[in-house]
């Protein structure tokens, strides 16, 4: 077993005792940091940054040099899997990700390959191995993937969407085609996450960014069902240590009980869910991650500290809380405010772990 100097994040996910509440930030390696912007400029564009193991490692480590974070998260993108399926990912200025050949019907789905994670996605595994080597056991490394439903939204819509009418049309008019796509994605994601674990990821997270746009019944059938399949297929132990799995559905606060039934170790919460309520509902089954509104980082330091204190008090005493934002950090947040946030979590949480 590789020695970890700080395993607080892994312990909290497994609801084991910790000295203070661990903290990391979604998108902690990102555009709010001037050093990230410099490295991205050096890479040329976003996907070149993802595909260069040394540079992906550099941006993964940048926030850890600034803040006493309790975990590193692989620098990559959820769209690596659809890209490896040959959909032609590109980024349009101001528009975000686009695909040159979106999936429109069952025939398109049938043509999609299941990517080999050490081949088409080998650059991700190289990044994982490089980051693990450079972390030198300081903190654990989190691997991740998008959920099948969330990946499918981009693949069918051809990019980002506000109303999701194209994929919902497929869901209601041709559900078989969508289920075939989701099934292929679930297999691909399982292979992808297991390859990340074998390459050195010590925990994994499934981001279901768009699960919250579904009705409860559709969420069960088209999103949660496939995440459950992935959880069932994941390696749960590696290098002599349990590999915790976190599920995060943005806008999924009303479905926590069903999510906790999947056998995952933790649930991510967005900022619209009350953490005290979430703990009452599922805290005996899973750890909870979250859940400060990322926009709170625009507030003055004293207000940020007050919000941290409120969320810590909401969760209360005992184990099973990983502090995070309720979604990714915004790109124009002052880096010092992120520092205030991280420091406040450690300082103010000590009383809850005595």
Curated annotation (Swiss-Prot):
Enzyme class: lyase
Pfam families: URO-D
Keyword Lyase in annotation: yes
Subunit-structure text: Homodimer.
UniProt-listed CDD domains: URO-D
Main location: cytoplasm
Residues under site feature: Transition state stabilizer: 77
Residues that bind substrate: 27-31, 46, 77, 154, 209, 327
Species of origin: Escherichia coli (strain K12)
Enzyme Commission no: 4.1.1.37
Organismal lineage: Bacteria, Pseudomonadati, Pseudomonadota, Gammaproteobacteria, Enterobacterales
Biological processes per GO annotation: heme B biosynthetic process; heme biosynthetic process; porphyrin-containing compound biosynthetic process; protoporphyrinogen IX biosynthetic process from glutamate; uroporphyrinogen III biosynthetic process
Role, per record: Catalyzes the decarboxylation of four acetate groups of uroporphyrinogen-III to yield coproporphyrinogen-III.
Catalysed transformations (reactions): uroporphyrinogen III + 4 H(+) = coproporphyrinogen III + 4 CO2
Protein known as: Uroporphyrinogen decarboxylase
């Amino acid at each position: 077993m590789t020695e970890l100097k700080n395993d607080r994040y892994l312990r909290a996910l497994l609801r084991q005792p910790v000295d203070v509440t661990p903290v990391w930030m979604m998108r902690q390696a990102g555009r709010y940091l001037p050093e990230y912007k410099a490295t991205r400029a050096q890479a040329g564009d976003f996907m070149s940054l993802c595909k260069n193991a040394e540079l992906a490692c550099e941006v993964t480590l940048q926030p850890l040099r600034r803040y006493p974070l309790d975990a590193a998260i692989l620098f990559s993108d959820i769209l690596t899997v659809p890209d490896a399926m040959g959909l032609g990912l590109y980024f349009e200025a101001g528009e975000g990700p686009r695909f040159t050949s979106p999936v429109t019907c069952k025939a398109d789905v049938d043509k999609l390959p299941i990517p080999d994670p050490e081949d088409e996605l080998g650059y991700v595994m190289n990044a994982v191995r490089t980051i693990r080597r450079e972390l030198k056991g300081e903190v654990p490394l989190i691997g991740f993937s998008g959920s099948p439903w969330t990946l499918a939204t981009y693949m069918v819509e051809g990019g980002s969407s506000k109303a999701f009418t194209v994929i919902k049309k497929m869901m209601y008019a041709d559900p078989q085609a969508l289920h075939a796509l989701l099934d292929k994605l679930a297999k691909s994601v399982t292979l992808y996450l297991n390859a990340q674990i074998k390459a050195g990821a010590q925990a994994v997270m499934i981001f279901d960014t768009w699960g919250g746009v579904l009705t409860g019944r559709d969420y069960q059938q088209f999103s949660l069902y496939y995440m459950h399949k992935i959880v069932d297929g994941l390696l749960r132990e590696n290098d002599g240590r349990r590999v915790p799995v976190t599920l995060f559905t943005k806008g999924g606060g009303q479905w926590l009980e069903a999510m906790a039934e999947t056998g995952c170790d933790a649930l991510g919460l967005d900022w619209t869910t009350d953490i005290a309520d979430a703990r009452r509902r599922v805290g005996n089954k899973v750890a909870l991650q979250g859940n400060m509104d990322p926009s709170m980082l625009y507030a003055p330091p004293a207000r940020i500290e007050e919000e941290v204190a409120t969320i810590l008090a909401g969760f209360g005493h005992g184990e099973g809380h990983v502090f995070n934002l309720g979604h990714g950090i915004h790109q124009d947040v002052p880096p010092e405010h992120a520092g205030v946030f991280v420091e406040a979590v450690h300082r103010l949480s000590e009383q809850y772990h005595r």
